[in-house]
């Protein structure tokens, strides 16, 4: 069983591509594709779930488990935020990754919300116990962009791990908690009202609002990531350029397609890091 979330742009077509690719590879499966009910009442979502998963499923029981799932999503995002902000400064390379895999194992074994809360507490305690030497003023970089490209490690060629390996503190506003569970489009646009008036598509408002927030918080830079041809994020780029000029914060733009090379990405990230390090040294 695969679950595909929907989207108002090409995100809604990802499920069709995944279905086609996996069937060409010989897999047999049922796909729960929410793109088929985008914008429809909750009842339609429930009907699709019952038809695909279990016609006899209890709706109240399903709601309880869905709420537990939402709790797990929030916990995973909280743990990931801590990991991104601190993993670059571990004394023993690999400690954070080892702790994170143990945390994921605990979450996979969780059977109810109580188990999820216990796994979260144990996981964060494990993270905080890792010996670190974090400088008082580390290089801080925010990550923004198109949902799947900016978040998925395979899609962005491991940008997060590359930057953590350079000793960079990372922040990522774009996650399921902020984009799906607690999303408020009007508040986001209001927070960046000097730069945007209207919603330009899927994650555009969050991209712009997050970039402005990072600039106002004194971040050293922001990296914008998108799949090649993603129109909403292309529309964001001139706005980000304005923010970059106004706030004196560099914003490199990474566009991914089938020809994007790992070596080329390394070169760009290393040059970006060197520039930030020299700028920070100059400001001391």
Which role does the model predict for each range below?
Residues 1-284:
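An N-terminal assembly and electron-transfer interface module characteristic of large anaerobic redox
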């Amino acid at each position: 069983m695969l679950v595909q979330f929907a989207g108002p742009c090409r995100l809604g077509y990802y499920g069709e591509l995944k279905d086609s690719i996996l069937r060409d590879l010989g897999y047999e499966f049922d796909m729960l594709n929410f793109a088929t009910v985008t914008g429809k009442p909750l009842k339609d979502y429930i009907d699709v779930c019952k038809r695909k998963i279990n016609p006899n499923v209890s709706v109240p029981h399903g709601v309880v488990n869905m709420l537990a799932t939402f709790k797990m999503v929030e916990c995973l995002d909280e743990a990931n935020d801590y990991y991104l902000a601190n993993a670059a400064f571990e004394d023993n390379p690999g400690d954070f990754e080892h702790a994170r895999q143990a945390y994921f194992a605990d979450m996979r074994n969780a059977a109810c919300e109580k188990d999820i809360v216990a796994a979260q507490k144990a996981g964060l305690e494990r993270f905080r116990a890792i010996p670190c030497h974090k400088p008082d003023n580390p290089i801080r970089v925010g990550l923004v962009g198109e949902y799947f490209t900016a978040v998925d490690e395979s899609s962005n060629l491991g940008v997060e791990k590359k930057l953590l390996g350079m000793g960079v503190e990372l922040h990522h506003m774009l996650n399921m908690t902020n984009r799906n569970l607690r999303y408020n489009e009007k508040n986001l646009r209001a927070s960046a009202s000097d730069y945007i008036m209207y919603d330009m598509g899927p994650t555009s408002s969050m991209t712009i609002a997050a970039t402005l927030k990072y600039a106002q918080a004194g971040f050293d830079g922001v990296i914008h990531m998108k799949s090649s041809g993603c129109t909403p994020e292309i529309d964001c780029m001139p706005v980000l350029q304005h923010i970059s000029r106004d706030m004196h914060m560099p914003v490199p733009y990474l566009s991914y397609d089938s020809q994007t090379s790992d070596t080329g990405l390394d070169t760009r990230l290393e040059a970006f890091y060197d520039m930030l390090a020299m700028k920070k040294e100059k400001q001391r």
